Amino acid sequence: MKLPADLRSYSQITRNSIAMILAGGRGTRLRQLTDWRAKPAVPFGGKFRIIDFPLSNCVNSGIRRIGVATQYKAQSLISHIQQGWGFLDGRFQEFIELLPAQQRTEESWYQGTADAVYQNIDILRSHNPDYVLILGGDHVYKMDYAKLLADHIAKSAEMTIACIDLPLEEASAFGVMSVTKDGRVTDFTEKPSVPTAVPGRPGYALVSMGIYVFNADFLFDQLIRDHDDPNSSHDFGKDLIPHLVPRSRVFTHRFSDSCVNMVSGVPYWRDVGTVEAYWEANLDLVQVTPDLNLYDQDWPIWTHQEQLPPAKFVFDNDDRRGQALDSMVSGGCIISGATVRRSLLFSNVQVRSYSVLEDSVILPNVDVGRNARLRRVVVDKNCIIPPGLEVGFDPVEDRKHFYVTETGVTLVTPEMLGQKIHYVR
């Protein structure tokens, strides 16, 4: 990977930092995709899970002390991290530590994002960091956190919020900020109904990415103060940040200053929090030159690597031809006399003869029966698609059996097909 010229100073900053990834959220807007897994454990991009992106950003940035706070249906997330992220070397104080809600300080689960960090304050303190990086575990992006940390130090900030411009119609789902010319935050409102536009850029708001850097001692003091506040919901966006903005040195960091290898000059960051956004972000990857470059060897996305054979395409007859066009097909897949167009197939998917898949996202271990036709669908892990099933052509009929978004993207799960699968996904 490419390293900055002043590597020594960056290395010292990252060595003295610890990252805390908040990975306990359910992600209810993903509907049945999160019935059996936390949002950070949802598969993405053919072979990854969403959690792999912030974890990879940490490792690639030189941050090798990482805590992952888990809560909601965490088993698949825990298994994934244990199987795929055991390569850090404890002899050099490198680790990924899983931090489930343990009721360490009182008899309650994590009550909010700030409380999730507060309940692990003793663990964080034991590592004696200078800086604490707070990350969400449910966004897809590539960011050099070393540059974020360096910016935080250069501004003598007590807290730094990574930010990005979003259209006003999308900004209501995030924390929205107003800032001075030098980037100091003057106002912060969590999920406002009417977001404030960026001066000089009508139609856009400056929003928080849910990525924060704190001076460690400052953070610990603020977490204790917030914990003792009976009126607080113990959330960074709702409580902690609005309290700090008028009282402390809170600055922003533009994502464009630390986004890694931008393809089109626009930083890529996706909150794949709805079925439609998830479908769109996956299918973005089948473009000739996608905005998210998964083939970037300078900034690899690390994950659990299953030992799988290559994808196979069989039959080349006039009436059935195994082929995939403008698509990504992962290891272990067999396209047997079927046609796949503009689709993304995760590992171990079998598509049987005479079937057609178009604009579809197929998660691992799916078996598509003969003569099936799937269009604009997301198919969850382990589904067995019956022969001849058609989905994506009649929204009225589809809604009787599956979940269909307003724009006609259909989610199919084993339960919707009457298939009971009683294990983690």
UniProtKB/Swiss-Prot annotation:
Family: Belongs to the bacterial/plant glucose-1-phosphate adenylyltransferase family.
Reaction(s) catalysed (UniProt annotation): alpha-D-glucose 1-phosphate + ATP + H(+) = ADP-alpha-D-glucose + diphosphate
Name of the protein in question: Glucose-1-phosphate adenylyltransferase
Binding site for alpha-D-glucose 1-phosphate: 110, 175, 190-191, 208
Single annotated GO MF: glucose-1-phosphate adenylyltransferase activity
UniProt signal peptide: none
Provenance organism: Nitrosospira multiformis (strain ATCC 25196 / NCIMB 11849 / C 71)
SUPFAM superfamilies reported in the protein's UniProt record: Nucleotide-diphospho-sugar transferases (SSF53448), Trimeric LpxA-like enzymes (SSF51161)
EC assignment: 2.7.7.27
ATP-binding as UniProt keyword: yes
Subunit structure of this chain's protein: Homotetramer.
